[in-house]
């Protein structure tokens, strides 16, 4: 399986970079993971009407340009569908059975994702009603993808 993580912004903190490196290593026997980062816009300091929408539009344009061809697109969205780890594993397994082996997960920036990016997604996925920093969400997503492959293969998983 080929999985693209399309993310707004770069990881800067060492602990997040180490966690990302660890999960990419753990995932290497199961899937080819490609990280694609697009530039994050600065959020406006003022509450000027339309400023947030302008940020979403700029980031959204960058994201849409980088979505690989012929892939199943999954946008992380706090208003999306919530799945258990087993349900998520089942979803990935079903995609594989249907021959859909190219996936693209999209993680927005601080402002979230533009409506046109959400509309492009085959699935809008939520991990919780909580709001997480988008940098941390990347690590949580990698962990859940790893857990899903362990579930699919019937392998034990303990950290």
Swiss-Prot record:
Main location: cytoplasm
Pfam families: SPOUT_MTase
Family named by the database record: Belongs to the RNA methyltransferase RlmH family.
Species, as recorded: Desulfofundulus thermocisternus (Desulfotomaculum thermocisternum)
Entry's EC annotation: 2.1.1.177
NCBIfam families xrefs: PRK00103.1-3 (NF000985)
Signal peptide: none
Assembly and interaction partners: Homodimer.
Enzyme class label: transferase
Domain of life according to the entry: Bacteria
Transmembrane segment boundaries: none
Gene Ontology CC annotations of this record: cytoplasm
GO MF, one annotated term: rRNA (pseudouridine-N3-)-methyltransferase activity
InterPro entries on file: Alpha/beta_knot_MTases (IPR029028), RlmH-like (IPR003742), tRNA_m1G_MTases_N (IPR029026)
Location(s) in or outside the cell: Cytoplasm
Chain's role: Specifically methylates the pseudouridine at position 1915 (m3Psi1915) in 23S rRNA.
Catalysed reaction, written as an equation: pseudouridine(1915) in 23S rRNA + S-adenosyl-L-methionine = N(3)-methylpseudouridine(1915) in 23S rRNA + S-adenosyl-L-homocysteine + H(+)
Entry keyword Methyltransferase: yes
UniProt keyword Flavoprotein, yes or no: no
Matching PANTHER family: METHYLTRANSFERASE (PTHR33603), RIBOSOMAL RNA LARGE SUBUNIT METHYLTRANSFERASE H (PTHR33603:SF1)
Identification of the protein by name: Ribosomal RNA large subunit methyltransferase H
Keywords from the UniProt entry: Cytoplasm, Methyltransferase, rRNA processing, S-adenosyl-L-methionine, Transferase
Record: residues binding S-adenosyl-L-methionine: 76, 108
């Amino acid at each position: 399986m080929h999985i693209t993580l399309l993310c707004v912004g770069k990881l800067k903190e060492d602990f997040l970079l180490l966690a990302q490196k660890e999960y990419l290593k753990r995932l290497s026997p199961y899937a080819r993971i490609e990280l694609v980062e697009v530039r994050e816009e600065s959020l406006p300091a003022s509450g000027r009407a339309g400023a947030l929408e302008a940020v979403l539009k700029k980031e959204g344009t960058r994201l849409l340009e980088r979505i690989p061809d012929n892939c199943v697109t999954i946008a992380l969205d706090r208003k999306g569908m919530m799945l258990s780890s087993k349900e998520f594993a089942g979803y990935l397994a079903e995609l594989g059975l249907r021959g859909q082996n190219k996936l693209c997960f999209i993680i927005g920036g601080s402002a979230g994702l533009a409506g046109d990016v959400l509309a492009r997604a085959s699935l809008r996925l939520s991990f919780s009603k909580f709001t997480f920093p988008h940098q941390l969400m990347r690590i949580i997503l990698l962990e859940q993808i790893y857990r899903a492959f362990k579930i699919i293969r019937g392998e034990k998983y303990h950290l």
